[in-house]
Amino acid sequence: QMCIRDSRDTREKIVVSLDEVNEKLAEVLETMQNDMLEKAKAFLASHINDAHDYNEFKAIAETKPGFIRAMWCGDEACENKIKEDTTVTSRCMPFGDQEQISDVCVCCGKPAHKLVYWGKAY
């Protein structure tokens, strides 16, 4: 006896004998999970843009969906100005991703040591 395995992610149909169903399904599920994870990682990476000055920050906020990575001085006034001007707010300051993409705050130009991911709420 045979069955047809229809993959929802690739639209691929494969005929499998009932004796092999358990083995094949385990392989298919692992492959599907890995493919979905890689697709999600690629999507995320393609929706993160770096801004090095305020004009670039505003241009990205107006034209590109996703997150903006930019340096911030830590001053709440800068955060509020960014929110007022662009409707973009800080989303996170990751612990492990503290590379310095610039030495200055994207908003005021003062020395900055915090890498922040910014984004719009939808």
Task: Walk through the language-model features, giving the residues of each.
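NTP/phosphate- and nucleic-acid-binding module
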Residues: 1, 5-122
